[in-house]
């Protein structure tokens, strides 16, 4: 099991890396992935215990990696991930790079919401539509 947090709010990752049983509150929490912007988890000790007992890890991913993962999932798989789901995909990539997960292993990635609840891409980057006379088709 791998716990995933945004680098701008990663109290569980910090506690896991320090070997602590409880996570200290993260001050100045900031991430586009609002669903994982949790400065102080109520069940921190349960999460840390589950990660340790599973032989897992806790990983933090930066905002750039989150957005890259969201874009890649849309472009390559046709999936509209929420930023939280992008964080999970980015962490999976990080886990592969660190050999925490084998490339031949089966992994389950959770996308806990939908990209529709977040603002769409910048309008200036969308396709340009032209008016057309449909009768002439």
Where are these regions (language model features)?
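Active-site/ligand-binding loops adjacent to catalytic centers
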Residues: 2-81, 124-137
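Phosphate-binding loop/pocket of nucleotide- and phosphate-handling active sites
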Residues: 24-27, 87-137
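A glycine-rich, Thr/Ser-enriched phosphate-binding loop motif common to dinucleotide/cofactor-binding enzymes
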Residues: 82-86
């Amino acid at each position: 099991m791998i716990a995933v947090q945004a680098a701008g709010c990663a109290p569980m990752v910090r506690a896991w890396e320090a070997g602590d049983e409880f996570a200290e509150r993260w001050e100045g929490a900031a991430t586009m992935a609002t669903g994982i912007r949790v400065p102080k988890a109520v069940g921190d000790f349960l999460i840390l215990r589950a990660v340790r007992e599973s032989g897992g890890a806790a990983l933090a991913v930066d905002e750039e990696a989150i957005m890259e993962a969201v874009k890649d999932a849309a472009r390559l798989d046709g999936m509209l991930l929420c930023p939280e789901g992008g964080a999970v995909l980015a962490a999976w990539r990080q886990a592969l790079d660190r050999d925490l997960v084998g490339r031949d292993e089966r992994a389950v990635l959770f996308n806990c919401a939908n990209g529709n609840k977040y603002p769409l891409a910048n309008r200036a980057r969308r396709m340009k539509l032209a008016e057309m006379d449909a009768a002439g088709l």
